A protein has these predicted regions:
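N-terminal nicking endonuclease/strand-transfer module with a His-rich metal-binding environment
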Residues: 1-133
């Protein structure tokens, strides 16, 4: 079973996206996907959406990490699961970049998504209690 954790990004969205898209970790970017943005311009896209947001918050994005036990899943399956998680969690409202890192002994996904949705420009509400239900 996968282990998942999430934390807020308050400043360096561009550096976080550069890190998760590292070609050495993602098989030359084979395991990089996105929704409603391009990985190359996601930080700018997120900023544009945030500039139109109704709520003010220090958070610019969220970084979700989904780690699998060694041998639990293959690279392609892990990436598919990461995209499915992002789609289900964000309901097609938030831009995101999902990558699968394959450079360690365990496969793991990184999902960075904009804190403001693309439709009504409302903020994502991170309620940790809801993740356990």
């Amino acid at each position: 079973m996968a282990y998942t954790k999430i934390h807020a990004i308050k400043a360096t969205v561009d550096k976080a996206i550069d890190y998760i898209c590292n070609p050495e970790k993602t098989d030359e970017k084979m395991f990089v996907s996105s929704y409603a943005c391009s990985p190359e311009t996601a930080a700018y896209d997120f900023k544009y959406t945030l500039d139109h947001c109704r709520e003010n918050s220090p958070n610019k994005a969220y970084h979700l990490i989904q780690a699998f036990a060694p041998g639990e899943v293959g690279f392609e399956e892990a990436h598919r699961i990461g995209k499915e998680l992002a789609d289900k969690l964000l309901e097609g409202k938030f831009s995101y970049v999902v990558t699968t890192h394959i450079d360690k002994g365990h496969v793991h996904n990184h999902i960075i998504f904009c804190v403001a949705d693309n439709i009504e420009h409302n903020k994502y509400h991170d309620c940790k209690q809801s993740y356990y239900h």
